[in-house]
Amino acid sequence: MNCPLLTIKAAAKLITEGGVLAYPTEAVYGLGCDPLNKDAFQQLLRLKQRPLEKGVILIASSIAQIEPFVKLHNQAWTEKVLASWQVLNQPVTWVLPATDNVPEWITGGRNTVAVRVTQHPDVMALCNQLNFPIVSTSANLSGEDPVTTMEACCKAFPALAIMQGNLMGISAPSQIWEAQTQKRLR
């Protein structure tokens, strides 16, 4: 395996310097970058061969980290969203109304953004080190199956560094729910 393996501290440095990182999540490997760095984001889309219109997920270590990006409070669904992020080993991503702070490249041109508060200890530590959420999209070429091993991740993206760590053993990527309609999207 030729991909460099990074500590959490080195991974945070890479992201702050505008890099794209592969990292373990709850169920699959993800690709991430600073959501406010357009150049890094465009590099991520090129690597993944993903169209801009699809949008991506922001993954954070805490509700406080996503608050600048979403209209979360005082909504009919607020309590359900907040409670879902407290359930262990059941990662849930919510599509929520975006604030004006969210760049169009993150939303895919919509007025919503997908967000998740992670329970993965290494991703939490990374977001805490950065003090902001990161982009999270599965580490695979668009349309292919997500990768579930470090080796497969390195084979798919040989030029990327991978943050050390393990998947949490959850069998499927996070559920995605639309908060305003309460419909499950995935």
Curated annotation (Swiss-Prot):
UniProt cross-references to InterPro entries, sorted A to Z: DHBP_synth_RibB-like_a/b_dom (IPR017945), Sua5-like_dom (IPR006070), TC-AMP_synthase (IPR023535), TC-AMP_synthase_SUA5 (IPR050156)
Main location class: cytoplasm
Positions of the YrdC-like domain: 5-186
Gene Ontology terms: cellular component: cytoplasm
Claim: Ligase is one of the keywords in the record: no
Entry keyword set: ATP-binding, Cytoplasm, Nucleotide-binding, Nucleotidyltransferase, Transferase, tRNA processing
GO biological process: regulation of translational fidelity; tRNA threonylcarbamoyladenosine modification
UniProt subcellular location: Cytoplasm
GO MF annotations in UniProt: ATP binding; double-stranded RNA binding; L-threonylcarbamoyladenylate synthase; tRNA binding
Keyword Transferase on entry: yes
Catalytic activity entry: L-threonine + hydrogencarbonate + ATP = L-threonylcarbamoyladenylate + diphosphate + H2O
Pfam families with a match to the protein in the record: Sua5_yciO_yrdC (PF01300)
Family annotation (HAMAP family): TsaC
Family of the protein in this entry: Belongs to the SUA5 family. TsaC subfamily.
Matches recorded under PANTHER family: SUA5, THREONYLCARBAMOYL-AMP SYNTHASE
Purpose: Required for the formation of a threonylcarbamoyl group on adenosine at position 37 (t(6)A37) in tRNAs that read codons beginning with adenine. Catalyzes the conversion of L-threonine, HCO(3)(-)/CO(2) and ATP to give threonylcarbamoyl-AMP (TC-AMP) as the acyladenylate intermediate, with the release of diphosphate.
Protein's name according to its UniProt entry: Threonylcarbamoyl-AMP synthase
